[in-house]
């Protein structure tokens, strides 16, 4: 049986049931939601045509009271092949403890542990978590699961639709995990295809030992990739392993990579994780403010840019003023290339770089 102890509408549960061909057990504390879930289960079963639906149940009750639920459902002692849960959680997950999820994770695992069928690597557990979970909270989740099943594998999965946002964070544990891939990154593309990286998660480190020079390339990389720690696998696709590269920034919304050569942007595995990339034309002599905008315009015109997009940290009030001034000042090169202005730390302090897109 596939168990979801907080099934809500039941759609995720029934999706797993249809995919695995196994009956499901959904538990819902809200009676109206339980009725909706039961109706959804019937609809999915009718569309799928499998035989799993005949033994699928939705129980109105407390998902942390395993014994009572199993008794009501008339199921044996260890009937659960897969436990999946997407607990309700506070919006600002980093400011709350894991036990503020509903149902609380530690209580849930403790209640169901003795009722999970265990294979060679432990039970199969899938937990959807807040995409904003901190590293410390992820470690806490691992500790909760590992306390009961010390040697079971664990796979953390990040899912992103782009724009530097993590759309889903899931932990796959025990029989549900990929024993060879502690981390997995899925990038969902608009055409329905998926770009996938998997392997060991490695924390990226910054290197601002020297100032970026004209002719080098700056690339803003999707922050979701660095959250997964799989940026080295991506980098091996992006440039030759013989070509040097270093991270100028690894946190925030604009992780910044410096390379000596352009990236292989014709490869979807590379381009799908790139926000913008360009060749450094010059370093701005003055910072982007109302006093320095004319100097930046001179450099942009010298690079024959038709547009220079601000990709640096600016106050919300100043950004549109400066962007309007740049747009107006670059009308003389309507057939020029696109460019961007990006900030980066250097050994001499903050720097701003004018880059031209390929």
Task: Tell me the role of every PLM-derived stretch.
Residues 1-358:
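SAM-dependent transferase fold signal centered on methyltransferase-like domains
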């Amino acid at each position: 049986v596939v168990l979801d102890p907080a099934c809500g509408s039941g759609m995720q549960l029934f999706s797993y049931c249809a995919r695995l061909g196994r009956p499901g057990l959904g538990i819902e504390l809200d009676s109206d939601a339980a009725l909706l879930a039961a109706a959804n289960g019937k609809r999915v079963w009718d569309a799928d045509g499998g035989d799993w639906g005949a033994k699928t149940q939705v129980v109105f009750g407390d998902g942390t009271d395993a014994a009572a639920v199993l008794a009501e459902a008339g199921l044996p002692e260890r009937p659960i092949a897969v436990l999946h849960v997407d607990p309700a959680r506070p919006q600002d997950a980093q400011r709350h403890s894991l036990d503020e999820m509903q149902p609380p994770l530690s209580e849930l695992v403790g209640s169901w542990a003795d009722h999970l069928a265990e294979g060679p690597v432990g039970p199969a557990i899938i937990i959807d978590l807040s995409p904003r979970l901190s590293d410390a909270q992820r470690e806490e989740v691992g500790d909760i699961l590992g306390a009961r099943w010390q040697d079971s594998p664990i796979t953390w999965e990040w899912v992103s639709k782009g724009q530097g946002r993590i759309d889903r964070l899931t932990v796959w544990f025990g029989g549900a995990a990929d024993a060879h891939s502690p981390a997995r990154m899925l990038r969902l593309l608009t055409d329905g295809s998926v770009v996938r990286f998997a392997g060991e998660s490695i924390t990226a480190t910054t290197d601002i030992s020297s100032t970026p020079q004209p002719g080098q390339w700056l690339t803003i990389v999707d922050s979701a990739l660095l959250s997964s720690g799989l940026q080295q696998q991506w980098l091996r696709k992006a440039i030759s392993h013989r070509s040097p590269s270093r991270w100028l920034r690894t946190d925030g919304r604009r992780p910044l990579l410096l390379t000596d050569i352009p990236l292989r942007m014709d490869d979807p595995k590379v381009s799908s994780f790139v926000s913008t990339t360009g060749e450094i034309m010059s370093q701005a002599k003055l910072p982007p403010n109302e006093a320095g905008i004319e100097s930046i315009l001179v450099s942009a015109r010298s690079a024959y840019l038709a547009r220079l997009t601000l990709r640096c940290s600016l106050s919300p009030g100043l950004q549109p003023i400066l962007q309007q001034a740049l747009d107006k000042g670059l009308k003389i090169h309507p057939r020029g290339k696109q460019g961007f202005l990006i900030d980066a730390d250097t050994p001499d302090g903050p720097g701003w770089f004018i880059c031209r897109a390929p």
